[in-house]
């Protein structure tokens, strides 16, 4: 896993926040979310859907791609009363 992380780091040429109003999360399967509301790192050539979370999250999720959720979908998945 460490080698993968180093490989990914070497690909990063730009760090920026993901764009849009969505809430960021890492995913493995569509119903496996974590890293919500954390900053993302993005390869310069990519759009925000190819970003990755910069902060630690659940070990099983770490290093997965960051995913943008529109606010309505986020409300459906994570009702924050």
Swiss-Prot record:
Record-level Gene Ontology MF annotations: calcium channel regulator activity; sodium channel regulator activity; toxin activity
Propeptide: 1-16, 66-81
Disulfide-linked positions: 18-35, 26-40, 34-53, 42-51
One GO CC term, this protein: extracellular region
Compartment annotation: Secreted
Annotated keywords: Amidation, Calcium channel impairing toxin, Cleavage on pair of basic residues, Disulfide bond, Ion channel impairing toxin, Knottin, Neurotoxin, Secreted, Toxin, Voltage-gated calcium channel impairing toxin, Voltage-gated sodium channel impairing toxin
Domain of life: Eukaryota
Keyword Ligase part of the UniProt annotation: no
Post-translational modification Arginine amide, affected residues: 62
Known tissue expression: Expressed by the venom gland.
Entry's family note: Belongs to the neurotoxin 28 (Litx) family.
Protein function: Toxin active against insects (S.frugiperda larvae). May act on sodium (Nav) or calcium (Cav) channels.
Comment block on domains: The presence of a 'disulfide through disulfide knot' structurally defines this protein as a knottin.
Official protein name in the record: U1-sicaritoxin-Li1c
Originating species: Loxosceles intermedia (Brown spider)
């Amino acid at each position: 896993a460490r080698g993968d992380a180093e490989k990914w780091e070497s690909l990063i040429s730009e760090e920026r926040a993901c764009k849009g109003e969505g809430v960021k999360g890492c995913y493995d399967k569509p119903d496996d979310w974590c890293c919500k509301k954390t900053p993302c790192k993005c390869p310069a050539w990519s759009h925000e859907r190819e970003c990755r979370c910069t902060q630690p999250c659940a070990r099983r999720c770490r290093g997965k791609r960051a995913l943008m959720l529109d606010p309505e979908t986020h409300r459906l998945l994570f009702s924050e009363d």
